[in-house]
Amino acid sequence: MRIVITGASGNVGTGVLRALAAEGGHEVVGLCRRPPDPVPPYDGVVWHRCDLADSRSRAVLDEVLPGADAVVHAVWAFQPLRDAGLLHRTNYAGTLGVFDAARRAGVPHVVHTSSIAVYGPAGEEPVDERWPATGVPGSVYGQGKAEVEAELRRFAAENPQMAVAVLRPTLVAQRDASESFRALFFDPLVPRWLIRLVERGALPVLPLPAGLRVRFVHADDVGDAVVRVLRTRASGAFNLAAGPTVTADDLATLVGARALPVPPSLVRAAVGALWRLRLLRASPGWFDVGMRSPVVDSTRALDELGWEPRVSGTDAAREQLRGLADGAEGGSPVLRRDRLRGMGGQRLS
């Protein structure tokens, strides 16, 4: 297959490239703002420079997409949160631009990588793909995902000749994304040496929000799911999560500490104050994503795609923590700290 991947050098895109390379036999075209060096898994990919926030991206898409068997859309701007216009141009307008270009080019299959943040709040029980996709309240990220998915549902209904799939992963982890995560969300308040102390068990007590529940999924498992969707030309939404659910106690145990429950309202207030002071890049909305995104059920991916995560949620969390402590970075510019520092806005693409 000839497969075009937007955001191919980012966290999810890197996992997709690994999975496609492992399967072999594909012609892969990567679109991103800063093409990576020709090292695995980025070698063997035909790269085109493309910034979806730029009006010139339409010409690039119209040049590259004709003849593609599928498009995998893996671009999403997380930062700068203070520039709503840039986020809208990249995320909302950019996504719709990719889908419209795929329609013009006659691409039969389009895959959009979304998030469980698209769901509205739920109770304790896992939710499947039928849960209302209204977005995490108060989160620019969650609301943005919900708005885009609503448009894609309309797009799919108006273009029945195209198969449209949406993947909704939980927190996507991999060692190579560690330094970019820290730079995107924790700079400048949380230095690497502090994370290293935590990861090596130097702190006997770890303050964490009471009631925290997080499910991880490894980027390579997301890549595997994408390949399975492409192979079967699947459509519709698929939750992607690896068990078990990781609680505050579990996170503390991973670093040899005891969790100290902190009221979520206090943590959110602290995050808000630090964000307003520009001491933290993560806004209160990101805290809401972590606390209010529901636990999801991935049964549909298992039944229809045969997808089973090879990395457990606990092991994915452990890999991410160790990567954060080590300052691990990947081979693409967007996953390297030297390209993140001092930048006004970062996008995983």
Q: What are the roles of these predicted feature ranges?
A:
Residues M162-R213:
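NAD(P)-dependent short-chain dehydrogenase/reductase
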Residues G138-A165:
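Active-site Tyr-X1-5-Lys
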Residues A93, G97-Y141:
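Conserved Rossmann-fold NAD(P)-dependent oxidoreductase catalytic core, especially the SDR/UDP-sugar
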Residues Y42-S55:
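Rossmann-fold cofactor-recognition segment
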Residues L52-A93, A101:
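NAD(P)H-binding glycine-rich loop region in Rossmannoid oxidoreductase-like domains
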Residues L86-G97, Q143-G144, V217:
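Glycine-rich NAD(P)-binding loop of the Rossmann-fold in SDR/ketoreductase-type enzymes
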Residues I3-E23:
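N-terminal Rossmann NAD(P)H-binding glycine-rich loop of SDR-like oxidoreductase domains
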Residues R213, D221-A282, S298, E319, ...:
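Mid/C-terminal beta-alpha module of Rossmann-like enzyme folds, strongest
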